[in-house]
């Protein structure tokens, strides 16, 4: 399914984002899924297409026990970057401040998914629970 859906997206000149919902996974599973997506893309597509296939950390909707972070934590993003490269990583879920956004960019993410863009741009604290 990963191969078929990636092919369909790329054939239509779209960006493909594979959401692995890291809050539902352990470190080993994050590594395995990131590597699986990377290996399928590298084995089946030209290097020029790599930049159009993202591995994304979260939808932002996954409910965790005890309100633990549900997406882009430093630890999960590092695992994704180390195992998805050369595919780009999109940090999503829980990036709510300018400091968090800068930290993700410094780690190497290529995109950030956030409902707090205005607050981040204004360097203000987000009021969003989304």
Give names to the regions the model predicted.
Residues 25-36, 79-86, 95-111:
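Catalytic cores of alpha/beta
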Residues 3, 7, 31-35, 74, ...:
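Amphipathic, non-transmembrane alpha-helical secondary structure
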Residues 18, 89-93:
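Conserved hydrophobic beta-strand within the GNAT/NAT acetyltransferase core sheet
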Residues 14-17, 72-85:
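N-terminal small/glycine-rich loop or linker at the start of catalytic domains
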């Amino acid at each position: 399914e990963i191969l078929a859906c990636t092919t369909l997206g790329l054939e239509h000149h779209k960006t493909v984002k594979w959401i692995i919902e890291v809050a539902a996974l352990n470190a080993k599973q994050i590594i395995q899924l990131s590597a699986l997506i990377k290996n399928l893309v590298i084995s089946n597509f030209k290097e020029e297409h790599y930049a159009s296939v993202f591995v994304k950390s979260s939808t932002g909707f996954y409910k965790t026990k005890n309100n633990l972070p549900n997406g882009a934590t430093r630890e999960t993003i590092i695992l994704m970057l180390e195992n998805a490269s050369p595919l780009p990583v999109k940090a999503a879920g829980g990036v709510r401040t300018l400091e968090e956004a800068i930290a993700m960019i410094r780690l190497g993410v290529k995109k950030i998914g956030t409902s707090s863009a205005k607050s981040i741009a204004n360097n203000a604290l987000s009021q969003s629970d989304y």
